[in-house]
Amino acid sequence: MKIGIIGAMEEEVTLLRDKIDNRQTITLGGCEIYTGQLNGTEVALLKSGIGKVAAALGATLLLEHCKPDVIINTGSAGGLASTLKVGDIVVSDEARYHDADVTAFGYEYGQLPGCPAGFKADDKLIAAAESCIRELNLNAVRGLIVSGDAFINGSVGLAKIRHNFPDAVAVEMEATAIAHVCYNFNVPFVVVRAISDVADQQSHLSFDEFLAVAAKQSTLMVETLVQKLAHG
């Protein structure tokens, strides 16, 4: 099995990258892909860049060039569920765009023409992630993750997301674009991110302060998940 891992920022991939043996670097389309073995398992780690276009471009290049069997999207996210705090884990059961609106033509809010309203994560990957969470004794929430090209740190943006997606557990800027590409390629995916901030008016301050905490937690989760997927 070859496992594809996608993170947007240097801070979100550096700990994992340092653990890859026999590492080689591929630069394509402004993205960097690091291939090798993570604890004996073949991996391809993508640093995509921030935002939906960068994530979709990177995911496409990763899938075409490295042919992974599954995709794990890792990194940080803003917490929406009331039980979440910095360092906690969110696992996707679905991903949707929070900034797409073609409802004038009868589509659901967040749905693009020719696409489902949401992109479902793979049940087996979800189950494996939840098993890792129990083993590591981490606090985690599974649910809807929403994505858009905006960092949410104000009451207006937050209120709009809560109104349109009352069940969303986290918000970030890449996951749904990655899920969209995986849907088109028919490749299983799951989003496993750590909370770096609570999506409120001070989130930009807590994000800078706690990004390292989120990166450490998400790296721990992904490393454990890779082991479980490879060896059961």
Swiss-Prot record:
List the EC numbers from the record. 3.2.2.9
**What SUPFAM superfamilies has UniProt attached to this entry?**
Purine and uridine phosphorylases
Q: What does it catalyze?
A: S-adenosyl-L-homocysteine + H2O = S-(5-deoxy-D-ribos-5-yl)-L-homocysteine + adenine; S-methyl-5'-thioadenosine + H2O = 5-(methylsulfanyl)-D-ribose + adenine; 5'-deoxyadenosine + H2O = 5-deoxy-D-ribose + adenine
Please tell me one Gene Ontology term that the record gives under cellular component. cytosol
Q: GO MF annotations for this entry?
A: adenosylhomocysteine nucleosidase activity; methylthioadenosine nucleosidase activity
Q: Biological process GO annotation list?
A: L-methionine salvage from methylthioadenosine; L-methionine salvage from S-adenosylmethionine; purine deoxyribonucleoside catabolic process
Tree of life domain: Bacteria
**Pfam families the UniProt entry points to:** PNP_UDP_1
| Catalytic site | 12 (proton acceptor), 197 (proton donor)
Identify the InterPro entries for this entry: MTA_SAH_Nsdase, Nucleoside_phosphorylase_d, Nucleoside_phosphorylase_sf
The metabolic or biological pathway listed in the UniProt record of this protein is: Amino-acid biosynthesis; L-methionine biosynthesis via salvage pathway; S-methyl-5-thio-alpha-D-ribose 1-phosphate from S-methyl-5'-thioadenosine (hydrolase route): step 1/2
Which cysteines in this chain are paired by disulphide bridges?
none
| Membership in a protein family | Belongs to the PNP/UDP phosphorylase family. MtnN subfamily.
Q: What does this protein do?
A: Catalyzes the irreversible cleavage of the glycosidic bond in both 5'-methylthioadenosine (MTA) and S-adenosylhomocysteine (SAH/AdoHcy) to adenine and the corresponding thioribose, 5'-methylthioribose and S-ribosylhomocysteine, respectively. Also cleaves 5'-deoxyadenosine, a toxic by-product of radical S-adenosylmethionine (SAM) enzymes, into 5-deoxyribose and adenine. Thus, is required for in vivo function of the radical SAM enzymes biotin synthase and lipoic acid synthase, that are inhibited by 5'-deoxyadenosine accumulation.
Q: What is this protein called?
A: 5'-methylthioadenosine/S-adenosylhomocysteine nucleosidase
Underlying gene: mtnN
